[in-house]
């Protein structure tokens, strides 16, 4: 990545800065990290902007490896029809949303999409169960019993389901998140 052909143009950098919450330095670092995942023959700027990286490769990044929602994060940000890879722009979008400077509304919108495992626009009991299992782990010693899970989900819905339809929609989720001062600072990935 040392040659002059391996740097993003000033125009492209400016465009990415306008479209994301990232600084010029963060964009350059993101490009370098993305290119490290590409085969050497695809590391030119032109190739890197048109080559997709598999989830397997993206998930090898230390910043994502330990995240319990790593697969969902990749799926939500992938523009691939098969949702199995990320382009550089997908990768930038991901990093932008998880940056310190992204707005709480943007962060909560994407958190909702990540937690909506069945992509139906609501968090139902199954989504909430999967969310809890991701957070607690699915090992014998950490997994909640069926009655504990039911009680926890009942409590979550009691607190969050304002319209009492048995699910949490985006506005209900954002209302709950707005009362959580640590959410925005904990919803981040730093390269």
Swiss-Prot record:
GO terms for cellular component: apical plasma membrane; axon; cell periphery; centrosome; cytoplasm; dendrite; endoplasmic reticulum; filopodium tip. One of its GO terms (molecular function) is small GTPase binding. It is found in: Membrane; Cell membrane, Sarcolemma; Cell membrane; Apical cell membrane. Its main location: membrane. A lipid is attached at residue 2 (N-myristoyl glycine). The keyword Heme does not apply. This is Calcium and integrin-binding protein 1. The binding of either calcium or magnesium significantly increases the structural stability of the protein in comparison to apo-CIB (calcium- and magnesium-free form). The keyword Lipoprotein applies. InterPro entries: CIBP (IPR051433), EF-hand-dom_pair (IPR011992), EF_Hand_1_Ca_BS (IPR018247), EF_hand_dom (IPR002048). Expressed in cardiomyocytes and neurons (at protein level). Expressed during early neural development. Residues 103-138, 148-183 form the EF-hand domain. It is a lipid-anchor. Pfam families: EF-hand_7.
């Amino acid at each position: 990545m040392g040659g002059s052909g391996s740097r993003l143009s000033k125009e492209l950098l400016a465009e990415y800065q306008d479209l994301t919450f990232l600084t010029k330095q963060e964009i350059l670092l993101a490009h370098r990290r993305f290119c490290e995942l590409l085969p050497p023959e695809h590391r030119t700027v032109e190739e890197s902007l048109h080559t997709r990286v598999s989830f397997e490769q993206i998930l090898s990044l230390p910043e994502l490896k330990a995240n319990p929602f790593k697969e969902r994060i990749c799926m939500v940000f992938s523009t691939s029809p098969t949702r199995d890879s990320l382009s550089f722009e997908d990768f930038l979008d991901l990093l932008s949303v998880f940056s310190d400077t992204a707005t709480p509304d943007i962060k909560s919108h994407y958190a909702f999409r990540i937690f909506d495992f069945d992509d139906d626009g609501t968090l139902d009991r199954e989504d909430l169960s999967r969310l809890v299992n991701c957070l607690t782990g699915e090992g014998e010693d950490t997994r909640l019993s069926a009655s504990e899970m039911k009680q926890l989900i009942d409590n979550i819905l009691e607190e969050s389901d304002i319209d009492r339809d048995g699910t949490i929609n985006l506005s209900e989720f954002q209302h709950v998140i707005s009362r959580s001062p640590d959410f925005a600072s904990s919803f981040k990935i730093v390269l």
